[in-house]
Amino acid sequence: MLSDNYDVIVIGAGPVGGYLAWKLTQSGLTVLLVEEHSEIGRPFQCAGMVNPSAMDRIGAFDTVLTRIWGARMYSPSGTEILIGNPDTTRTWSVCRKLFDERVVQLSLDSGADLLLSSKPINAT
């Protein structure tokens, strides 16, 4: 059941909003997370690229589709140019829907409330 009073209202239940709500609830604040859509992670907003430090904070490795270490480029003459290191992860490609859900779930598990299908139009 939703409260009538919150310390913080976070607008947008994407990865950043979910992470912010999680951290705020961990610090003891009451948080309402508001999302205009009826489902977390839909519609898709952007590609699912998560840098290693963010993934380490979230720990949602079960959402990873592939690891990206860099690229191999080839000149017209066939010379290979290596960008990055195959032994080092530069970014993770994730399933955005699952990743978004996982981040929001962290905030809910910490005590945040979630309000879906709600679009704020005014604040005082």
Where are the regions a protein language model picked out?
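Short alpha-helical segment within the catalytic ATP-binding CA
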Residues: 19
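Beta1/beta-strand and adjacent pyrophosphate-binding region of the FAD-binding site
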Residues: 1-16, 32
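Glycine-rich FAD pyrophosphate-binding loop
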Residues: 9, 22-45
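N-terminal FAD cofactor-binding segment of flavoenzymes
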Residues: 37-76
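Conserved N-terminal helical subregion
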Residues: 67, 73-124
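Fold-independent oxyanion-binding glycine-rich loops
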Residues: 13, 36-37, 76, 118
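Residues within well-ordered alpha helices
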Residues: 23, 54-57, 106
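Glycine-centered loop/turn motif at secondary-structure junctions
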Residues: 28, 58-59, 111
